[in-house]
Amino acid sequence: MSTIDLIILGSLYQSPKSAYDLQKQIESRNLSRWIKIGSFTVYKKVVQYENKGYVVSETVKNGNMPEKTMYTITAKGKEIFNEMMVQFSLAETRVFLDFNAVIVNMALLDESSADACIANIKNSIQNTKMQIAEQLPTHKDIPLFGRTILEQQFLLLETLEKWEENFEKELAKEREEK
């Protein structure tokens, strides 16, 4: 089971939802920035959960609206959710950054190309930090458990900015010594 499973089951633990409603909630909480999940994945997951007995489905129709399938978490699903909460809270903290693959291979590039990649990484860190900084004031009214993730990401990006500045200085120093 993955963090995606934990997020989807957690959402269904709060209240029954359709796959579409789950996807919209993931988007509205900006969770798609932190986990890779698409609408087809959500649909595929709820079908898997139903086959495993974690959720039950019910097709409902409201007025003139088209039918939709609502998913409700079962006792077994709640048990799995609770087990995953413990499992993930005990897991080793790992930080995966796609740009680390660029850093590892940077020695294979000429200086100009390497500098361009560094500038791209720097811009990406700064842009993401700015986006989160803009969101923080507007999210003061959301519950602590959601707001704290934004704050965590902002602090991590500040640390990455410092790391990137150090990396540039060390690289410049290494180039001077050659």
List the model feature ranges, each with a label.
Residues 106, 135-140, 171, 175:
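Secondary-structure edge/capping motif, primarily at the C-terminal ends of alpha-helices
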Residues 14, 44, 120, 152-155, ...:
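DHp/HisKA dimerization-phosphoacceptor four-helix bundle of two-component histidine kinases
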Residues 132-151:
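Acidic interhelical loop/turn segments
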Residues 146-178:
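Long, low-complexity, charge-rich intrinsically disordered regions
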Residues 82-127:
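Amphipathic alpha-helical dimerization/coiled-coil segments
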Residues 1-92:
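Basic helix-turn-helix/winged-helix DNA-binding cores
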Residues 125-136, 157, 164:
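Non-transmembrane amphipathic alpha-helical segments
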